[in-house]
Amino acid sequence: MACLLRSFQRISAGVFFLALWGMVVGDKLLVVPQDGSHWLSMKDIVEVLSDRGHEIVVVVPEVNLLLKESKYYTRKIYPVPYDQEELKNRYQSFGNNHFAERSFLTAPQTEYRNNMIVIGLYFINCQSLLQDRDTLNFFKESKFDALFTDPALPCGVILAEYLGLPSVYLFRGFPCSLEHTFSRSPDPVSYIPRCYTKFSDHMTFSQRVANFLVNLLEPYLFYCLFSKYEELASAVLKRDVDIITLYQKVSVWLLRYDFVLEYPRPVMPNMVFIGGINCKKRKDLSQEFEAYINASGEHGIVVFSLGSMVSEIPEKKAMAIADALGKIPQTVLWRYTGTRPSNLANNTILVKWLPQNDLLGHPMTRAFITHAGSHGVYESICNGVPMVMMPLFGDQMDNAKRMETKGAGVTLNVLEMTSEDLENALKAVINDKSYKENIMRLSSLHKDRPVEPLDLAVFWVEFVMRHKGAPHLRPAAHDLTWYQYHSLDVIGFLLAVVLTVAFITFKCCAYGYRKCLGKKGRVKKAHKSKTH
């Protein structure tokens, strides 16, 4: 017995030291994030990887929004030619411009210019990073095992190529929905709606025509947004570079998708779905928020937030919203830092910040007023809370359309809606049981999975670090030209064969026909000469 006990102790100690050794010799990961809400899900993955013993270095511009110090990673800071005030002003302009009136004809141009306010800033960051020789030398000397990035803008993609590192993308979507084109996934326009169209996967003929035309315009939009990055990449890599080719070198795509929100579509084997990764177990609320909920009585609360980029609204619109909120019996917790509307009702409480997921997970929450950003939509799905959606930009319009199609919420045009529209929408999602039933059904489907999204994401990042990439998952479609991919050369060859055979057959028939006619003609002539 004592011998068995000693053996067990030795085995236990061995397992402990092996685990400890695995933690000590963890891999090195270089993280190139995108500031703002995109960082939130990436941060969760980074923290778990750090807890598992990996050494994490996060590349951070010295002026930023959310990329703060942490015990989980080391920040590598690089200088940028602007200050915190300019950063704040750009984001404020970006948010406020979405409430400006615009005509149908000028809307695309206005949206493009507004997006460039922020995208231009990210390009300055990328330029500053890739031209900082000291920082690049540090990366080379550090000998990282992989690079983890958000590829919505391609700075991390270029850096991975420069350092020769396998890469993992954490991704929601490009501004022009070309991620499936880059991954070579089948992407038929007949049933897969393009970004910003607000179409479902069951399109009318006219919608399919529009979808087809948008598909033709997407490469041009990509060129407009990314041509500067292509020039920058060529200068850094000292060769002519095609950005699309760089994107195609990714090892694994971690896509913040789930088919409870997305329309079904084919994907490639190196594309992993981790939609809902931001959903966490509800934590206890602070005394302040618990008091608000307790005071709401049987009617419960409504949570109202338009995301991290928008916390102020033009006065006239804010007053219209406040008027609608005052006409429902629920207590409304509104994340808002602008001027307090003069008509704000007693049931509406303004807060500078709110624990969104924890509030949505509370059983007294009746509805969620949201801009339909992917984080908020997934938190609403996870917690089973119906939505009133006021999309502002990016993928929010499409997210809202998807949830409305599934009967989980009501969509309003924030520029055109009236106080009465918002009031009616709130009363509908709160009082009509079908909205609650539909969102609970989606919640049940979403949470019925073998592996949690966060665990899945961590596994694949570690997989790429362990194996120095995932070439076995890379489809051969990347090695084909566009005409080979669509089998145009094969079609052309077979068409040429058919035409050649048809031509030869025609010539043979024509020759035979002429021969036969010629023979008959000679026979007739001979017959006539004999009769004479």
Swiss-Prot record:
Signal sequence annotation: 1-26
Recorded GO MF terms: enzyme binding; enzyme inhibitor activity; glucuronosyltransferase activity; protein heterodimerization activity; protein homodimerization activity
GO cellular component entries: endoplasmic reticulum; endoplasmic reticulum membrane; intracellular membrane-bounded organelle
Tissue occurrence: Expressed in skin. Isoforms 1 and 3 are expressed in kidney and liver. Isoform 1 but not isoform 2 is expressed in colon, esophagus and small intestine.
EC code(s) of this entry: 2.4.1.17
Stored PROSITE patterns: UDPGT (PS00375)
Effect listed in the UniProt record for changing residue 7 to A: In allele UGT1A6*2, allele UGT1A6*3 and allele UGT1A6*4
Note: The gene is part of the UGT1A complex locus which displays alternative use of promoters, first exons and terminal exons. The locus is defined by 13 first exons, which are alternatively spliced to 3 other common exons and 2 alternative terminal exons 5. From the 27 possible mRNA isoforms, 9 produce functionally active polypeptides (UGT1A1, 1A3, 1A4, 1A5, 1A6, 1A7, 1A8, 1A9 and 1A10) called isoforms 1 (i1). Use of an alternative exon 5 (5b) as terminal exon is leading to 9 additional alternatively spliced products termed isoforms i2 and which lack transferase activity.
Name of the protein in question: UDP-glucuronosyltransferase 1A6
Organism: Homo sapiens (Human)
Lineage: Eukaryota, Metazoa, Chordata, Craniata, Vertebrata
